[in-house]
């Protein structure tokens, strides 16, 4: 048996939307798969997200409270999850998003045989679609955190008609197709019996009302494409491909419903000096042959400034040094990963006579066989 949504978020049944949102944020911080060590974190995160989506939607919450948890879950399965859309691309319209999920009124009617809430279909408050876009940042910004300006073109409610799709005071009439209900009903005879299906009225598009003129600005759509400039807070430690959510910055809702959210996929640019692996960083540092033989103190760059590293005598090319705590910050957690510095002994491409003579004497005095040293990843693994 699945858990009650109020219990999942730890709120009372009369909790306000703000209280539910705050409870969800706390659960998200605790159980987000990127930050939690709990083996069941992903499932708990999904449960909290589902609970928030239902309890912050006025219509869904009303149905949930009326039906109870188990019957609501059954009705949802029976109704299915309608809609859905692809991801937005980098060219053209940068946004994508789902159609906003299932119609709870239809599910309620199917489950109880049409005894749901009356009124026109167009009067229901619906949350707007979530929108998706991308934002590129530097590795330094991922390390330190940053405030970025994001310019987007997104659908917004038309100011001229206040999102209604028709001018104020336009003459109207009840839609004769659906008799003002916003939905039409079709009955089909199947081997299992008669099946009743309700669909949005095509003639009035679910409004239940026909108007003699449409808004010239939005052409009756109720929304227009506008440019918006948003400030995005980039948390330190964010990784390439992770998504930030800006609540209520998505597409406008219908009939006074809340806006959807804006989902921002973060893309971290490659860095010339560092390669990232989770919370760890890798850096290759060139040293000279004498430094490798006799040892030296070298200066190594980090994302937090330069540090000095002692290279012991006899260091081999490809050897890895671990600088604890010099890697990436752990997202929404304390501490940093490590920086792994792989030294590469540089072979000189030109020698003067004195250098050649010294090396020849060195070679004659040696006589030892040289083994091929283990690779970078083997050294990295063995250093852990």
Curated annotation (Swiss-Prot):
Residues 29-60, 73-131, 160-191 are annotated as: Disordered. It is found in: Cytoplasm. Keywords: Chaperone, Cytoplasm, DNA replication, Metal-binding, Repeat, Stress response, Zinc, Zinc-finger. Its main location: cytoplasm. This is Chaperone protein DnaJ. Its cofactor is Zn(2+). Homodimer. Participates actively in the response to hyperosmotic and heat shock by preventing the aggregation of stress-denatured proteins and by disaggregating proteins, also in an autonomous, DnaK-independent fashion. Unfolded proteins bind initially to DnaJ; upon interaction with the DnaJ-bound protein, DnaK hydrolyzes its bound ATP, resulting in the formation of a stable complex. GrpE releases ADP from DnaK; ATP binding to DnaK triggers the release of the substrate protein, thus completing the reaction cycle. One of its GO terms (biological process) is chaperone cofactor-dependent protein refolding. One of its GO terms (cellular component) is cytoplasm. Pfam families: DnaJ, DnaJ_C, DnaJ_CXXCXGXG. It comes from the Archaea. The gene is dnaJ.
């Amino acid at each position: 048996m699945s858990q009650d949504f109020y219990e999942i978020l730890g709120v009372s049944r009369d909790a306000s939307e703000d209280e539910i949102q705050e409870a969800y944020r706390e659960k998200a911080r605790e159980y987000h798969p990127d930050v939690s060590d709990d083996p069941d974190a992903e499932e708990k995160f999904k449960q909290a997200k589902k609970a928030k989506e239902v309890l912050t939607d006025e219509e869904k919450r009303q149905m949930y409270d009326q039906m109870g948890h188990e019957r609501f879950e059954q009705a949802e399965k029976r109704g299915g999850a309608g809609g859905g859309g692809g991801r937005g691309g980098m060219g053209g319209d940068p946004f994508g998003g789902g159609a906003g999920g299932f119609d709870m009124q239809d599910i309620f009617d199917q489950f109880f045989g049409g005894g749901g809430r009356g009124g026109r279909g167009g009067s229901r408050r619906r949350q707007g679609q979530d929108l998706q876009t991308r934002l590129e940042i530097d590795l330094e910004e991922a390390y330190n955190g940053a405030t970025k300006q994001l310019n987007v073109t997104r659908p917004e409610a038309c100011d001229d008609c206040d999102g209604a799709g028709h001018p104020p005071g336009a003459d109207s009439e009840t839609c004769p197709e659906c008799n003002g209900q916003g939905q039409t009903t079709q009955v089909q005879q199947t081997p299992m019996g008669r099946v009743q299906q309700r669909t949005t009225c095509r003639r009035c598009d679910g409004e239940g009302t026909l108007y003699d003129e449409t808004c010239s600005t939005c052409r009756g759509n109720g929304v227009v494409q506008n440019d918006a400039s948003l400030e995005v807070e980039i948390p330190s430690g964010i990784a390439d491909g992770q998504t930030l959510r800006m609540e209520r910055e998505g597409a406008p809702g219908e009939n006074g419903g809340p806006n959807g959210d804006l989902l921002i996929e973060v893309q971290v640019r490659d860095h010339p000096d560092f390669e990232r692996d989770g919370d760890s960083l890798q850096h290759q540092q060139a040293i000279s042959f004498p430094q490798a033989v006799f040892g030296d103190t070298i200066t190594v760059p980090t994302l937090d400034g330069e540090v000095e590293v002692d290279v012991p005598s006899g260091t081999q090319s490809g050897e890895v040094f671990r600088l604890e705590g010099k890697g990436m910050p752990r997202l929404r957690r304390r501490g940093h990963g490590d920086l792994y510095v792989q030294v590469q002994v540089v072979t000189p491409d030109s020698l003067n006579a004195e250098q050649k003579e010294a090396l020849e004497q060195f070679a004659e005095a040696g006589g030892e066989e040289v083994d091929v040293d283990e690779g970078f990843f083997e050294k990295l693994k063995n250093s852990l």
